[in-house]
Amino acid sequence: MQIIKTTIATFTAIAFTGAASFTSAEVVPLDRVVAVVDNRAITQTELDSRVQDVQVRSQAAGMRLPEADILNKQIIDQLISETLQLEMADRYGVQVSDQEVNASIGNIIQNAQMTEQQFVQQLASEGVSINEFRASIRRQLTMRSITEGLVSRRIRISEQEVDNFLKSADAQFWVSPDYHLGHILVALPSSPSSEAIVEAEEKANALYEKLKAGANFAEVAIAESNGPSALQGGDLGWRKSAELPTLFAELLPSLNNGDVTKPTRSQAGFHIIKLYESRGGQKQIVNQTRARHILVKTSEILNDAKAEAKLKDIRQQILDGADFAELAKTHSEDIGSRMSGGDLGWATPGTFVPAFEKTMAETKEGEISQPFKSRFGWHIMKVEERREEDMTQEALRQKARNMIMSRRFEDETQIWLQELRDEAFIDIKI
């Protein structure tokens, strides 16, 4: 930023005149600039901090690092990419709320299986304060937000692409349901006699009756099963439908969680299957909400207090009889919905940012929310109506779109970052 350049220039002037003006004072080394990206400086302190972070993580993972000059080059390259992303985030007014930062840190603490106090102590042992860590998380969330937003816009997925994907063998595998199964096998010899078949079937039926009476499936499997997972209590873990033998896959759609199948014969013997749990493949009935909103963005002129006050005034006008849609056309700064009177259409959970979702869930049909803040600015919202919708087919198609998007996202991100580099002024000084 220009402030950084000015500060550096001022400190440089003092450093050069210091010998004449402050002959008895100790000269404090300046923070060296290692790279300039447009009007932003990347300093030696930033580089050293990132190098130390990489060294600590690599040592913990038992990885060898390259020579220092190669490592520095890699890290400067990464810092340049991050700086370009943050520059774009500033340009588009992306803001990450404290609520989003707190939620992200909460997830990290939960995954680490620590208490908050233990986590803070762990950070301190690594020389990182909680405020520094929060700033790092905010930076990461900001970069993710701008990258996802701008790169996703560049990827166009046609309905024909979705159709073609859903017909592919690859898609049949990934969109098939997942099942957590238990398995008991009463095996048959390779060329069984009639007596052997009858004996195995009788044993399988006896085990089935035992299970129906309440016996523990895992204990029965350990004691009686001839299958490869017997010593794991017959637990096959989570398997996709497309991975299962046809015999199993045909039985499962009619089962509920906790059900046990009657013995079913294959060439290998008689199988008893328990469905512990399933996910995917069922009807997806979702609650949808249709809402309108008015967005007022903050600026140097319009701070939070003024934006909130403006929306309170608009809300009162609506309560006094003014039309929400007409006021949205006049006042809303959401370009996408302004001309439709702030109408956001039917939305499923997860469509909007957390602050928006929370208010939408808490606002009753026909009511107008109090002003609330998201990372986009200040809003008021009117919930028009709610409904339940069978989204099974649409959910399947959306899953396909997401998979196509994820496959193309990384490559498109690299292309986008390279375009940002091509358009930027970059001066690496080491």
Curated annotation (Swiss-Prot):
Gene3D superfamilies in UniProt: 3.10.50.40, Porin chaperone SurA, peptide-binding domain
Top EC class for this record: isomerase
Keywords: Chaperone, Isomerase, Periplasm, Repeat, Rotamase, Signal
Signal peptide (UniProt feature, chain positions): 1-25
Locations listed in the record: Periplasm
Top-level taxon: Bacteria
EC numbers on record: 5.2.1.8
GO cellular component: outer membrane-bounded periplasmic space
Purpose of the protein: Chaperone involved in the correct folding and assembly of outer membrane proteins. Recognizes specific patterns of aromatic residues and the orientation of their side chains, which are found more frequently in integral outer membrane proteins. May act in both early periplasmic and late outer membrane-associated steps of protein maturation.
Protein name per Swiss-Prot or TrEMBL: Chaperone SurA
